[in-house]
Amino acid sequence: MEEIYEKIMREGYGLQLRHGTRTRTGLVCRTDRGLCELKKPRGSTDSLRLAFDVKKRLRENGFANISRCYPTLEGEPFYRQDGTLYILEDVLPQGTLAEDSAEAFLQGAETLGEMHAAAKGLASEAAHWEKNRLPQLYAKRRSELAKVRRRNDKRGSYDAIDLLLLQYYEPYMERAAEAEELLCRGGYTEAIARTAQEGGFCHNAYKGEALRQETDGRIFVGNFDKCSAELPLADLAAYIRRYFKKTEGTAAGISAMLERYGRHCPLSERDMILLQGMLLYPEKFLRLVNEYYNRRRTCVSPAMRERLAAAAKEELNGTRLKSIIAGGC
């Protein structure tokens, strides 16, 4: 296995691998030109190309607290070996940002605002903007949920997950429809067009392992391999959800997070309406339901049942989160 890494470093990047240490994120490599980390990214080739362009723009605009991605000898943002993609990046601090206090989330919200602001002017051929992606996704998930309900009712017998779906069907269908309407009222299509023109992106994994903290308190951001051409507000909505999940979330805490984020990316009244829609939509529950029924299962997995039950309870926060944001408009 070490021979493969030596080959990747030599033929892909022109570096001599002298020693490698495995970590939870990849292989930290000591080379003839210093330390770097070789990783197997999770994203597609398009998302990796976009991530490369995003990082370049962030650094150009002064946001340097990221893992710089190094191009291959052929100028590509990734190297392909035996069908597997690899990327080479700077080594990030090993300590993750503790997500157990309101103060940590305030720091995270401000860093998120700084990062989104630094993406202005981003232009990438790998960014594929879709003017109605989220509204269409919300409508699609509602349609899928209705089909599952009809199929279950026609069959006439219900397993544990069918019963769970039955319990949450009406309220979550109503919330998904309201969320779709809020995106329309908040001008989602216009916001996408504006972001595409001005430059921006959505990280899609701004949490946990992606947030590293140096001993001096600085926060570094990694895990860009899932970034996409989407409203940056989607990152903020996901981070607010996580704040409520990881702490005893309060309205005051959310207001403070919005204020910290807004120092760098001011939030308009229409932005707040879009946030309401994103927070109200039961994203995790509907995604897991779709995943489960698309597998054409023959038995009910206890693990999946637990995941769905936990997601259903977690999504109950959506109405409260929407009300908190509405109160700030």
Language model feature labels by segment:
Residues 28-30, 69, 181-233:
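Active-site acidic catalytic loop and adjacent metal/ATP-binding pocket
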Residues 34-127:
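ATP-binding pocket architecture of kinase catalytic cores
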Residues 39-42, 125-201, 256, 305-311:
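ATP-dependent phospho-/nucleotidyl transfer catalytic cores
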Residues 285-329:
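ATP/Mg2+ or Mg2+-diphosphate-binding catalytic cores
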